[in-house]
């Protein structure tokens, strides 16, 4: 079979990602475009004659880049197409918005690259009474047009057949430009490198005349003749760029008049009716908050019901199973304990997180595909404008509920460096999926019937602190106003199940692999560090271990937030959590369990793998039956509680160590707001600079310590009024000084992003890494 590389390009919200998932299924690899952290997705699929590598290009409305501050997505798409890496392009076009989508199509066809138009979302177009003559459109464009409904898989085989039959586009003159424009474009093309095809050289000439700044990188000596060409044109026309765009729009209007009835189309009645409620100035925000509450409620409720299968099952396989193998094969005791408690315990810490994190990713994917996520940005526009940010900056922040890394990377879609940087600084405060796992464990141990409210309040606190951080930056070191907010609101539709599953699987797989590597290594390290004293002797009591000795020295620093000296395990959790927040649960589980080790030894004669696995399935089935009972819906934390008797087990020890719900909640505030994990730090450094990464870390530590201290000292004021008053005044005074210093430093701060100064011409090459972080 012949190998073929195809670029998939289209407008945002045209169904491009759904088509990508339909074609490639699970055969996807996620990496980065070289030199930048914008995600690059590649997939594999086969046709009758070809083995295809499909490259999913960022969504863009055109290939024209007027300003260096424009979204990097447009730059990447343009450079990839001009690089010649793609043998063929598939242009995904939204049939319900044909006129707007055809602008990009015309630019692609003018380049002369073999192109297939995938006319998607025909089901939505039909509901709006839009009729499109496919054959007439194909004849007008001079390339194959394949009707599709990617959410239902309709037209996929026809698209594969068109790929096998692909050839050069027919030589159809699509756009009629004014003769002076063509003359100057041809004069520029003559002095461009001769290895570029003539058609592409003329296209580059028109792009340069339109004001596209990145086409100059390919034009060679022609860029030196540009000013003279523009001067000659201005003697004959007012604005060359306007004439070029107008010629294209006239061509599009002529095509649409012949092939469709878009002028008599009816807007979606369902979308219009729902938007009257969802976008209502009074109801929009409460509905958004309810959707966010519903997201983590279902994640905890259904995910918690599935947890026994992963928890009890992994204990049976990786802890008791390894112990049984060790005793049966007569391993040394130390090796059996090391493998079962270190390796097996680490795996057992990761797997129970899967159901809840997976449900959250599934819910986020549903919101994105259904069209609600764009509405959330619209609803939050007024609030974001108050911060000097456009409403669409809230979209990457919402993505932060799943993981902060793509949230930081998503700031690339914003136009101005100031807006990108402010969004990057706000992103780490959005509560990610890993923090949800921590909140669920603490809620089960400390908050009982108020568990759901406690977790919801932490989510809202993260949003509030992100907003306050934006306000602080706006009035200190990043003054300015937001750019005008224009964003497409796609029609509501039911997401395709296959697409949802693939998106959820890709996110969950990345989480498990990333978390698993770190948690297992940390669990093994902690198990070893717990077994020896500072002098190197083996200890029987964890409180005599080297880890305990070192942690006790540091723990008094956290006394103002409610972490007492004997609760040194909580301090270790904070330090390991800087590597990855999901490690906090594993750390506390390892350390609190070690302190509560029972004298009862494992008996291999009583071990029955089948019975333990059956018990896991049975417990999961019972949990699923109870999931939607009224009591569980009122208190979803109960579904994931996991440890019914709080007097025993790791959760019981944790309950005793913290001593009060106030201390536990204060600890959670600190976990929510303090330093982001290593992968997020790396993303911040790559998207901005190491200096801004350092600022993000220090600012996060400051507000985490300040807010946690204020909460705990107010909650426990009656127990030690003098100490609490001193702590409260110290925190307030310190932050007044910090804000004052930031205001004075405003004139010396460079908000230009490091990433915007990078050469974008290198973005066409694929990153060799498969990790999107």
Swiss-Prot record:
Residues involved in GTP binding: 120-123, 149-151
Species of provenance: Escherichia coli O157:H7
Membrane topology reported for the UniProt record: Multi-pass membrane protein
TM segment ranges: 282-302, 309-329, 344-366, 383-403, 427-447, 453-473, 518-538, 664-684, 691-711, 722-742
Gene3D superfamilies for the chain: 1.10.287.1770, P-loop containing nucleotide triphosphate hydrolases
Domain FeoB-type G: residue ranges: 3-169
Function: Probable transporter of a GTP-driven Fe(2+) uptake system.
Principal subcellular localisation of the protein: membrane
InterPro entries with a match to the protein in the record: Fe2_transport_prot-B, Fe2_transport_prot_B_C, FeoB_Cyto, FeoB_GTPase, G_FEOB_dom, Gate_dom, P-loop_NTPase
Protein name in UniProt: Fe(2+) transporter FeoB
UniProt cross-references to Pfam families, sorted A to Z: FeoB_C, FeoB_Cyto, FeoB_N, Gate
Localization per record: Cell inner membrane
Protein's UniProt keywords contain Transferase: no
Induction statement: Iron uptake is repressed by the global regulator Fur.
